[in-house]
């Protein structure tokens, strides 16, 4: 488990550069760890073909990939210029009831200090199907820190946009105006703009217009299109989805596209250091199956690394990763990360049985990985 955590901190630069800076375990001659991907036998070939036969297109942000039907989406998140966006199936009656109950909940929330009351500051009725709550960030923080919580109903989909804001218009915050200013009006514009540009989307629907896909919805807008009221003139977009095998819950794929991350090195640069650390720490299950650069349609600077490791479930399993655009980092060329695990439960799998061995063999895992990742590409007209 410790080895996997160390490996993750090196692979994902945003999670911990400290380990790289401190380590001096630069051991040469790692070629002995490169075993290659084993050839599939007939049973393994049938297993992979069963996955391939059911692949269907799935939209992830501004990209798409063909996922086998055996994989179920278990996690989805979208953040655009600090605004968290989500969708939920509902009815108009349930929507109206939710808004009423949410208002009552916020209005009845107490604050730690009397001067920060009321907790619910305002309720903006943008139109008959769109409302925005303006409330304190929490019950303890001064009420200059706000949350704008917007909801919009479109057919049978309720969209939510949540964004932090600052309001120091009250006289007791006069001293703070020297180093920061109220931005609530601008952030309200941002929330309303995002809500207006959201529309429902079916699970396997692939839009042909610029915008971002997320679970249950689509946010229209070009990659270089500014967002009214946002703190930055350019877009910052982060989208992530996790798909878990319905039959083998220790097999999952995680996709992440993040325009805010730009690194000085690449995946293969970092994995050279990771291999040295794994070798020095003595993971008996560690081996490199394949690594190198690869071509993905419409995506530059893509690299992959496929290995065997001792997973967090303390079994021999597979950890595969693709990273692209790591040295570019923009809304038009976001950093892309695709991670595949075999022999380890994802964080979204709360209740699971003990694992004695990984569900797939190395050959099956690599074959499934190739079938999925080689279909990953930029969606037509997405940007």
Could you tell me what each predicted segment is?
Residues 6-17:
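Bacterial N-terminal signal peptides that target proteins for export
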Residues 40, 45-89:
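N-terminal mature-domain "stem" immediately C-terminal to a signal peptide or N-terminal signal-anchor/transmembrane
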Residues 71, 167-215, 338-383:
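Surface-exposed amphipathic alpha-helical segments
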Residues 74-118, 160-164, 238-275, 316-328, ...:
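A short acidic-to-branched-hydrophobic micro-motif
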Residues 106-155, 256, 260-331:
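Signature of long, low-cysteine stretches enriched in small and polar/charged residues
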